[in-house]
Amino acid sequence: MAEVAPAPAAAAPAKAPKKKAAAKPKKAGPSVGELIVKAVSASKERSGVSLAALKKSLAAGGYDVEKNNSRVKIAVKSLVTKGTLVQTKGTGASGSFKLNKKAVEAKKPAKKAAAPKAKKVAAKKPAAAKKPKKVAAKKAVAAKKSPKKAKKPATPKKAAKSPKKVKKPAAAAKKAAKSPKKATKAAKPKAAKPKAAKAKKAAPKKK
């Protein structure tokens, strides 16, 4: 049973690429409505273009009218309801059709108005690019303030205090200088011994 279960799981991913491949051709090329508008605009007939003439022009442009006959009719109806086409003869998809000049002229100014908006948006983008300059200026100000904080360390003061401790050996030297005085005091009694010798020498004179 464990060997049979992985087989459906392997088959499922294989189906997904087929759906993607089928979806790609739909995106390529202009829509049916665009082709119909081009065909009607190309015709010079004052009374309008019939549905049969539209199909011939679409077929000449490489569009498969036989397979997409229903799409052509739906597209014609939708263009009439939108106001892009005006139906001069007949009803529904059958009859003759003309371009609605007012609708076409209204679309052109709308496209021109959309173009300046795009330019304004492009002009606003450089303004957004200027913001990093302000950030850079703030960083520069922060960099200027940081040296002030660097001055706070009191290590040089401690180094200046240390020489005071060095002066203590000088006091020890003074004590050492005082000690020879004591040595001289101790040496004075030695000098008194010759006096005693002189006294002994003077004793024989009494005899």
UniProtKB/Swiss-Prot annotation:
Region forming the signal peptide: none
Pfam families, alphabetized: Linker_histone
Keyword DNA-binding applies: yes
Domain H15: 28-101
Domain of life: Eukaryota
Temperature dependence: Thermostable up to 80 degrees Celsius.
GO molecular function: DNA binding; structural constituent of chromatin
Annotated site (Cleavage): K138, K139
An example Gene Ontology CC term for this record: extracellular region
Expression sites by tissue: Oncorhyncin II is expressed in skin.
SMART domains: H15
Keywords for the protein's UniProt record, in alphabetical order: Acetylation, Antibiotic, Antimicrobial, Chromosome, DNA-binding, Nucleus, Secreted
SUPFAM superfamilies assigned to the protein according to its UniProt record, in alphabetical order: Winged helix' DNA-binding domain (SSF46785)
Residues modified as N-acetylalanine: A2
Coarse class of the protein's main subcellular location: nucleus
Location in or out of the cell: Nucleus; Chromosome
InterPro entries cross-referenced by the UniProt entry: H1/H5 (IPR005819), Histone_H1/H5_H15 (IPR005818), WH-like_DNA-bd_sf (IPR036388), WH_DNA-bd_sf (IPR036390)
Chain segments carrying region Disordered: 1-28, 105-207
Any GO BP: nucleosome assembly
Positions with biased composition (Low complexity): 1-15
Chain intervals with Basic residues compositional bias: 16-27, 117-168, 175-207
Protein function: Histones H1 are necessary for the condensation of nucleosome chains into higher-order structures. Oncorhyncin II has antibacterial activity against Gram-positive and Gram-negative bacteria at submicromolar concentrations. Potentially important role in mucosal defense.
Family classification: Belongs to the histone H1/H5 family.
Name this protein carries in UniProt: Histone H1
Organism taxonomic ancestry: Eukaryota, Metazoa, Chordata, Craniata, Vertebrata
